[in-house]
Amino acid sequence: MIIQLHENQRGQVRLNSHHSESFPITNGVKQGCVLAPTLFSIFFSVMLKQAMEGLDEDEAVYIRYRLDGSLFNLRRLQAHTKTCEQIFRDLLFADDAALVAHTERALQCLTSCFAEAAQLFGLEVSLKKTEVLHQPAPREEYRLPHITIGETVLKSVHQFTYLGCTITSDAKIDREVDNRLAKANSAFGRLYKRVWRNKHLKRGTKISVYRAVVLTTLLYGSESWVTYRHHMRLLERFHQRCLRIILNIHWTDYVTNVEVLEQAEIPSIEAMLLKTQLRWAGHISRMEDHRLPKIALYGELSTGNRDRGAPKKRFKDILKKSLGTCHIDHCQWSTLAADRASWRHIVHQAASSFEESRKDHLREKRRRRKNREASAATPNVTFDCGRCGRACLSRIGLVSHMRACSRRGLPL
């Protein structure tokens, strides 16, 4: 029946009001057909299987993992009899494919086999869209990779966008955060006159639009972010600027950031990230054991070591800190996450409690700063001029006044 749906297909090209002569369509799937995604996935899987046949086992990336025991007990991965290894060479989504390998030679072999299999099945690799990214090990010098398809040398880049997220050669999210801020700022600016300055819309409606359009753009893919304090400052600064524009709060009004969040009835970016990352971790823990995200979370690369001294933070480190902040036991969190509804309720309560604690901390910090400023101020102390006897409130004022007195020739 599927074959009959695709037999004797013909098409035409329409340009303005003119149509070309009809021509037969002998390959491909129907555009807009509900079967097209499934059929292409099956076709692509068979092609990929053909491409990977005969490859050496060392031309791949291995992950050593162990699903029992505590996630944060890394010593459990040192057991040789209780750990498993998972091999993967490709990361697929629809018609996008990412090939991964540890060495340049292995990646060249993978790329050549993939291109040959694609040509065998009537597909063509887009050379303009295909790029090579090299992520060197810590303290290893960056070397420009040389990967070819046929006689064409593929472009080597330090960053590229895959599924909407920016991946860089230094394995940091600095550029991703910058891109998210730029896209969110663009989305916010396009609605400036239409929504934010529209006097006919209620404040609640504007906040709902801000949540649906701007925040979703800003926090796209943030479930797996490994953030540092400077990233959080950039995100919170943008969040506050947008809310102050929506609420029409000027800097001369002297409204604190906590009061802005309370007026908008919206949490901080830090609380949002805490909530989304805990929910994402619970979703991974409920996955089947053969799923790659779960294997990556509960395992580590079989090849290579982390840098000594101050290594880069991992998602596990962020997760452990978030669990501690929410007062959730590190050893029992996966058991709690097994029940989806219960875990969502726990995370929601924990995020709300964290936000209240954060606000109280900021209020107390501001109160202490005001007290220090009040105690440091000495309005009753004066500095008297030895020439004319005038009292100045500050030492620098006295110096300036004495200079003027000396020009007038007053005696000491």
For the regions a protein language model found, what residue spans apply to each?
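Short linear motifs embedded in intrinsically disordered, charge-biased segments
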Residues: 4-412
